[in-house]
């Protein structure tokens, strides 16, 4: 099995090294293409206004000046030689990708690009990393078995699997739950205003560590309960009930003011 791995934390990220070790347990044909610099929050951005530079680090390892989406597209079309990857793994992200965050995640976007190119794709993230020295031990302990089982089972061609690991001792993690995407009832993103040495204001965008109250069956609830969450996602954002509702009210001749 040929595996391509990418991430959004950058080529030197500890999570990418962890994913290389995970992939090595599943195959001896592992390729890496990841951003030269951190691209967290890049979502499905493409680099269109400037050229993308590629740095070859090894026979099967590359970094690029582009986004995770750029990396996957370049790897599949240009850099991975001989035949296409059989599986794409994106991560392991430093911090969970849950609920509405998946629409901003470069990690999930890398997997979506793989899916769009016809490669079965899995995004992997681990909760936590609020303190120095935290490791990817939970992901490294459980990801190989989960990935192997998912590959054996298969999944629809238009689906990306979003896997999130809790950040707690391995011996306390005893369950995998297949979940739906949740939605927070609190706002965790915020802008922090600061002032530079010249008296000019600037901002850092960040996240508050505030928990919501998600219902059972969601990715958020599973992680809060210390479970591994596996969420099938797809790129079709259509809200079918709203389509059916609006068809009866807006279809036909365009309305006038």
From Swiss-Prot:
Any single Gene Ontology cellular-component annotation: cytoplasm
Binding sites annotated in the UniProt record for a divalent metal cation: 8-9, 40, 93
Enzyme Commission number(s): 3.1.3.5
The keyword GTP-binding is annotated on this UniProt entry: no
CC cofactor note: Binds 1 divalent metal cation per subunit.
Keyword tags: Cytoplasm, Hydrolase, Metal-binding, Nucleotide-binding
Compartments reported by the entry: Cytoplasm
Alphabetical list of InterPro entries matching this protein: SurE, SurE-like_Pase/nucleotidase, SurE-like_sf
Known catalytic reactions: a ribonucleoside 5'-phosphate + H2O = a ribonucleoside + phosphate
Enzyme class: hydrolase
Cofactors: a divalent metal cation
Cysteine-cysteine disulfides: none
GO molecular function, one term: exopolyphosphatase activity
Keyword Metal-binding carried by entry: yes
PANTHER family registered for this protein in UniProt: 5'-NUCLEOTIDASE SURE (PTHR30457), 5'_3'-NUCLEOTIDASE SURE (PTHR30457:SF12)
Xref: HAMAP family: SurE (MF_00060)
Role played: Nucleotidase that shows phosphatase activity on nucleoside 5'-monophosphates.
Protein known as: 5'-nucleotidase SurE
């Amino acid at each position: 099995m040929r595996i391509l791995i990418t991430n959004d934390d950058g080529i030197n990220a500890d999570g990418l090294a962890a994913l290389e070790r995970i992939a090595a347990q599943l195959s001896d044909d592992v390729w890496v293409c990841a951003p030269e610099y951190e691209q967290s929050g890049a979502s499905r951005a493409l680099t269109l206004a400037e050229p993308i530079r590629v740095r070859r680090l090894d026979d099967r390892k590359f970094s690029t000046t582009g986004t995770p989406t750029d990396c996957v597209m370049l790897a599949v079309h240009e850099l991975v030689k001989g035949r296409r990857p059989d599986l794409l793994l994106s991560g392991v992200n430093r911090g969970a990708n849950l609920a509405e965050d998946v629409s901003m995640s470069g990690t999930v976007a890398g997997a979506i690009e793989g899916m769009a190119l016809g490669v079965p794709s899995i995004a992997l993230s681990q909760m936590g990393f609020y303190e120095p020295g935290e490791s990817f031990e939970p992901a490294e302990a459980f990801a190989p078995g989960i990935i192997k089982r998912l590959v054996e089972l298969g999944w629809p061609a238009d689906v990306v699997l979003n896997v999130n690991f809790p950040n707690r001792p391995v011996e306390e993690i005893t369950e995998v739950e297949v979940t739906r995407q949740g939605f927070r009832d609190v706002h965790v993103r915020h802008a922090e205003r600061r002032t530079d040495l010249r008296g000019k204001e600037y901002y850092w965008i960040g996240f508050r560590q505030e928990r919501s109250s998600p219902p059972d069956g969601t990715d958020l609830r599973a992680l809060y309960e210390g479970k591994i969450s596996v969420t099938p996602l797809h790129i079709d954002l259509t809200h079918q009930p709203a389509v059916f509702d609006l068809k009866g009210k807006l279809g036909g001749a365009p309305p006038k003011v």
